Amino acid sequence: MMNYNTPKVSIVVPSLNSISYIRECIDSILNQTLKDIEILCIDANSTDGTLEVLKNYEKKDKRLRVIISDKKSYGYQMNLGIKEAKGEYLGIVESDDYIKTNMYERLYEIAKKNDCEVVKGDFYIFAYGKTEYVNVLRNSCEDIYNYKVNWNKDIRIFLGSDGINPIGIYRLDLLRTNQIKLNETPGASYQDNGLWFQIFALAKSIYFINEAFYMLRRDNPNSSVKSKEKVYCACEEYDFIRDFLKKHPDLEKTLAPICALHRFGNYMFTLERIDERYKLDFLKRFSQDFRKILKDKELDENLFGDGDMKIIYSIVENPENYYFLYMGYCNDMFGKLYFGASERIKWQLSYRIGKLLIDLKNPVQILKFPFKLFLEIKQFKFEQKIYKTTIKFYPNLQLPPLEEYSDYEQALKIKKHLSYILGKSFINNPILF
């Protein structure tokens, strides 16, 4: 039976011009096997028909309410939804995603059975007809599944779990008692980071289950993660998180380095995402922020890999030098690697060294070879560090197997080129050369 005063789960759906996806999203919520829910659609005055669609749903199902936001801010919309929610737990569904029919029944069942403030599950990423299962916990943390934890018991929840909020439910008392709110910056950019960090910092009981319910879209061309114009959003969000820690001195000493770690991951992602004309200015902000973090002794090098630390020190020391030496070819590198098997083969050290060997056509070039070889190997190692850092924080960006590329057969032919064969032989037996 539906309890209209206190439903089991209040589901907030912030929306703005989501007409292509909104019906699939709302239908998946209304069809939940858990019927005792309320749906709060917080629309920021959509102009593409989304608002009209939501109002039609509101007429047909009294569990759904449409609330108009006077600000186009994801954080403001979410805060409005949290304020209006009457439920025991909070759920979130983004307006371009959808969920499996048993999601909230299962999460609520686990939450009640284990008396948990937070329950999160695995999820799916889908794009262009392909779907991938993603674990909320990384391999090194899989032993945390099906146990009540918090960061005091196991700091790995901050290091090895996915920060996506809609894949879970959250006891509303936790948010209200601790006055947890999202940053109300304009648009939709990174505000979910602050919500995740606050919840994980303050929750006493978090539970992860090895089941997936949430369908996360990655082919929406209007998604904020694809915007090349939003430059400083990550900076503003991690300043917001750092201000939160200042208000909680009992958390600050331990969690400030965690904040710095995630700031780094998001800054690196921003560097890859934003338009070329903004990169140098962003690197200057990157340098400024991490110089302060280092000065305040808030950076725990044990949380970072050697490559990560070299990147940080390079940017802090000279952001302009980092930009001119590395960023130009790194942008080209990522574009080529993700869209061609042939480029993947040409990126390999065997091919690159082989090409240097083939170009040795006169005594001057032979004399220059050791220096060129040193630079090529140095560049290759740095590119590998950039790639490893990216997939460390965004595992879904890991390169697919070569055979999945459309030019796979052409790539195999490149392996038979003299340049590749020579380079491979050089790597295996450099003394012979």
For each predicted feature, which ranges?
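N-proximal low-complexity "stem/linker" segments adjacent to membrane-targeting elements
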Residues: 1-28
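Short, acidic, metal-binding catalytic loop of nucleotide-sugar glycosyltransferases
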Residues: 27-36
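A conserved acidic beta->alpha catalytic loop
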Residues: 43-52, 94
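Conserved donor nucleotide-binding strand/loop of the catalytic core
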Residues: 51-84
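Short aromatic/hydrophobic "clamp" motif used to bind/position activated sugar donors
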Residues: 90
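Membrane-interface aromatic/basic loop that binds lipid-linked glycans or pyrophosphate carriers
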Residues: 116, 276-344, 412-414, 421, ...
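Catalytic core of nucleotide-sugar-dependent glycosyltransferases
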Residues: 211-220, 225-251, 266-298, 359
